[in-house]
Amino acid sequence: MLNPPLNQLTAKVNSKYLIATTAAKRARELDERRETALLDQYHSSKPVGKALEEIADGKIEPVVPKEYLG
């Protein structure tokens, strides 16, 4: 089961693709530099889970280049 739930994530970011790419980039950053944590406490022990929790909490948002906004 995904924690946080997908509907909670899509309430913050309306694209599953953006959620996945943002979480992957943030997870890589968390894995390389653990001191960059944005939350006081995480439910997940894995970097991807931590990144998803940060997205659900509104601590990070995807960056979309202007040329893709149409």
Swiss-Prot record:
<keyword id="KW-0240">DNA-directed RNA polymerase</keyword>
<dbReference type="InterPro" id="IPR036161">
    <property type="entry name" value="RPB6/omega-like_sf"/>
</dbReference>
<keyword id="KW-0804">Transcription</keyword>
<dbReference type="InterPro" id="IPR003716">
    <property type="entry name" value="DNA-dir_RNA_pol_omega"/>
</dbReference>
<dbReference type="GO" id="GO:0000428">
    <property type="term" value="C:DNA-directed RNA polymerase complex"/>
</dbReference>
<dbReference type="InterPro" id="IPR006110">
    <property type="entry name" value="Pol_omega/Rpo6/RPB6"/>
</dbReference>
<dbReference type="GO" id="GO:0003677">
    <property type="term" value="F:DNA binding"/>
</dbReference>
<comment type="subunit">
    <text>The RNAP catalytic core consists of 2 alpha, 1 beta, 1 beta' and 1 omega subunit. When a sigma factor is associated with the core the holoenzyme is formed, which can initiate transcription.</text>
</comment>
<comment type="function">
    <text>Promotes RNA polymerase assembly. Latches the N- and C-terminal regions of the beta' subunit thereby facilitating its interaction with the beta and alpha subunits.</text>
</comment>
<dbReference type="Pfam" id="PF01192">
    <property type="entry name" value="RNA_pol_Rpb6"/>
</dbReference>
<keyword id="KW-0548">Nucleotidyltransferase</keyword>
<comment type="similarity">
    <text>Belongs to the RNA polymerase subunit omega family.</text>
</comment>
<protein>
    <recommendedName>
        <fullName>DNA-directed RNA polymerase subunit omega</fullName>
        <ecNumber>2.7.7.6</ecNumber>
    </recommendedName>
</protein>
<keyword id="KW-0808">Transferase</keyword>
<dbReference type="GO" id="GO:0003899">
    <property type="term" value="F:DNA-directed RNA polymerase activity"/>
</dbReference>
<dbReference type="GO" id="GO:0006351">
    <property type="term" value="P:DNA-templated transcription"/>
</dbReference>
